[in-house]
From Swiss-Prot:
It comes from Bunyavirus germiston. This is Nucleoprotein. The lineage of its organism: Viruses, Riboviria, Orthornavirae, Negarnaviricota, Polyploviricotina. GO terms for biological process: symbiont-mediated suppression of host gene expression. It is found in: Virion. It comes from the Viruses.
Amino acid sequence: MLELEFEDVPNNIGSTFDPESGYTNFQRNYLPGVTLDQIRIFYIKGREIKNSLSKRSEWEVTLNLGGWKVPVLNTNFPGNRNNAVPDYGLTFHRISGYLARYLLGKYLAETEPEKLIMRTKIVNPLAEKNGITWESGPEVYLSFFPGAEMFLGTFRFYPLAIGIYKVQRKEMDPKFLEKTMRQRYLGIDAQTWTTTKLGEVEAALKVVSGLGWKKTNVSSAAREFLSKFGIRM
């Protein structure tokens, strides 16, 4: 006779992942020696990288970005999405957020000539396609990178504000805000900051709402070129 056996499983006690600790580990092990050109490749080729990962079943993959090699746990493949990711494990999403945080810190600490170089080399496709450029401010521009929501304090709630704005405009399903709504804000848990930081979120949303969003297929370099002829896009 067929016997079906079932065993009890422990209750889900929640994730132990701490983005701050994860970033520190990433910074120590993978950021020394990394260049802006290598980071540029990661973001410019982001969609291509994700598409490639989604078609490969391997759980552990190494990305070679212009000589910068970083290991990735392939959660982009449908069959891997329920795999447990260690606290210090690197997914595409985590790497994106870590690099965004690194770029913001680097930008704010640099001289004006170095900032100009960064603005030239680092392009955020998700911001650019909405007509948002570095001119909107580094915190805003870099907040469009996936994973920036892990650092709501560093990015002054802009990742959340961008998500709220997209939902209000019917450009994004509200369910995609769930991950952001679980994040901490400068060490404050979500249950607390959602009641004590409403003013800060509203201020961030006001900034984001006033950015003059517009869909465009023209790059920032092309817009700058055309502006020399009095053409604004």
